[in-house]
A protein has these predicted regions:
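Compositionally biased, charged N-terminal/linker segments
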Residues: 1-40, 45-58, 120-125, 137-138, ...
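Extended aliphatic helical segments
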Residues: 7-13, 44, 57, 62, ...
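Short, Lys/Arg- and Gly-enriched loop/turn segments at beta-strand edges
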Residues: 51-73
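Aromatic- and Lys/Arg-enriched surface recognition patch
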Residues: 65-141
Length: 156
């Protein structure tokens, strides 16, 4: 079994808060090698950033909800990383992101563990959660320490 931390941008205002996919693992085109070792049964913490670029939909910009700058969920992977071609998300500056790689998960817990506490648990005072590719492998020890504190965290 592997343990992961994945980073999500806050939902756009036009996306449902309770969408089934909200706690899946998503990797953009070009970052899929990071997810080769993802398998069913793996555990993953979902971290939501404080902010992210707005999305361009046609000629209008769609804002994002305020981000929580916290781990917001713990999930279990139910299917390995798979490819599914999707339309690109066009960002406000014109850059495109294709979130073509995804691993389906089942949400186990939703609590809130702020970045400040995550830094203390990882013993990394400068940790920003700006994880290249949006996926970071955790050791069993790191996972256990985060889980212990996360389970005591604020409920949504």
């Amino acid at each position: 079994m592997n343990y992961w931390l994945t980073v999500h941008w806050p939902l756009r205002l036009d996306e449902r808060k309770n969408a089934a996919w909200r706690n899946w693992i998503f990797l953009a085109e070009g970052w899929q090698k990071l997810g080769k070792r993802i398998q069913a049964g793996d555990r993953v913490f979902i971290y939501e950033t404080e902010s992210a670029p707005q999305a361009r939909v046609g000629t209008r910009l769609v804002r994002r909800r305020p981000g929580r700058k916290s781990i917001i969920a713990l999930a279990t992977v139910i299917a390995p990383l798979r490819y599914k071609r999707v339309s690109p998300e066009i960002l406000e500056d014109g850059r495109e992101r294709r979130w073509n790689y995804r691993a389906h998960t089942r949400t186990n817990q939703e609590h809130r563990l702020p970045l400040t506490e995550l830094r203390n648990i990882l013993h990394k005072p400068g940790f920003s959660a700006r994880v290249p590719g949006g996926l970071m492998k955790l050791s069993g020890k790191q996972f256990s320490r985060i889980l212990r504190r996360f389970s005591q965290g604020e409920l949504f």
